[in-house]
Amino acid sequence: MEKREELYRGKAKSVYKTDDADRLILLFRNDTSAFDGKRIEQLDRKGMVNNKFNAFIMQKLEEAGVPTQFDKLLGDNECLVKKLDMIPVECVVRNYAAGSLVKRLGVEEGIKLEPSTFELFLKNDEKGDPFINESHVVAFGWGTAEQLVEMKKLSLKVNEVLSKLFDDAGLLLVDFKLEFGVFHGQIVLGDEFSPDGCRLWDKETRKKMDKDRFRQGLGDVIEAYEEVAKRLGVPL
């Protein structure tokens, strides 16, 4: 597989074309950002940890019947993925109250949500990824009603699979965001799944083991990521 020019550079990943029109290469960088890119730092080993963590999770989801864009690891910081036509919507599943939900509704952090909630946000950094609903997605042409049904179904399936996986590792899956795209007419899970895009707390101590350590200045960010990977059995 020949790596060609950079197609897109995000806050923490770069996307490259290949000699196959249906495949792209994702490069996980050490860049770590918060507050819609207003704060950016370099954290050693982060690209490698997130790349291998993402590969592990995507393979677990594939085994559970969730279609993903992941094909294979290419190295410590790179993987080969399917080229998706991305839907510009973030799907957020919450099992416990945290983050923007706490700020928006004034509820106490850590409350268990039963049932888990499903939310949509427009993927737009300039506008702060605003909270939207299903009718917005359809009315503005960001996706179809049928695609939304499938995205919600897959998001809840991911929650079912990963909640158990993390629970078995002594961790609470507090919340997470997913992005989807279309590959040959099928809705497929895209982007990544890593501690950058979810909240994970230790079951016993409620210690934060995710990107909130960076956002909140708690320190030991990569050490926490590596601890999560170790508990799951991710080969680093």
Swiss-Prot record:
GO CC, alphabetical: cytosol
Keywords linked to the UniProt accession: ATP-binding, Ligase, Nucleotide-binding, Purine biosynthesis
SUPFAM superfamilies according to UniProt: SAICAR synthase-like
Catalytic activity: 5-amino-1-(5-phospho-D-ribosyl)imidazole-4-carboxylate + L-aspartate + ATP = (2S)-2-[5-amino-1-(5-phospho-beta-D-ribosyl)imidazole-4-carboxamido]succinate + ADP + phosphate + 2 H(+)
An example molecular function term from Gene Ontology annotations: phosphoribosylaminoimidazolesuccinocarboxamide synthase activity
Pfam families found in the cross-reference section: SAICAR_synt
Principal EC category: ligase
GO annotation terms (biological process): 'de novo' IMP biosynthetic process; cobalamin biosynthetic process
Entry's EC annotation: 6.3.2.6
Pathways per UniProt: Purine metabolism; IMP biosynthesis via de novo pathway; 5-amino-1-(5-phospho-D-ribosyl)imidazole-4-carboxamide from 5-amino-1-(5-phospho-D-ribosyl)imidazole-4-carboxylate: step 1/2
Family statement drawn from the similarity comment of this UniProt entry: Belongs to the SAICAR synthetase family.
Protein name (database record): Phosphoribosylaminoimidazole-succinocarboxamide synthase
Species of provenance: Pseudomonas putida (strain ATCC 47054 / DSM 6125 / CFBP 8728 / NCIMB 11950 / KT2440)
